[in-house]
Amino acid sequence: PERKIVRVPDKLKQDIKVVTHSLMNQVASNPKILHEITPRQFEELVCELFEKEGNHVELTKQTRDGGKDLIILNNSSLGDFVIYAECKKRAPKYPVNVGFVRELYGTVNADNATAGIMVTTSYFSRDARKYQEKIKSRMSLIDYSELMKRIMACK
């Protein structure tokens, strides 16, 4: 199939950022909202958070995203880094298991990205944390608690 590049007008980009920023403020004042938004809204929220932290972030398409929801371009005095992020919106009592972390790490390696970040509205299983510990220079895990700290710091 032929691929087409769609240019999003700057005004529309700004409108999207305003809505997402408003959502970030709502989550900061009422964290329960985080569990009521759609998975795509969660991805957009995390995208906005990483942008506010000083990164350039690309949100991938909703389906067949190649195992990554966000592509984070981090430019610093140490170099240029490409970081893949996967967002897992889960109910508070359902952990993200090791399989998801392995899958993201496989995508990071296959695409020769610098590192990966898994972000969730829940928490990570013991096995997921154990696995991440082995690859900690190339994989970060952000659970609900850490995510809320970061949202509060950026509001």
Predicted region positions:
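Mixed-charge (Asp/Glu-Lys/Arg
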Residues: 1-155
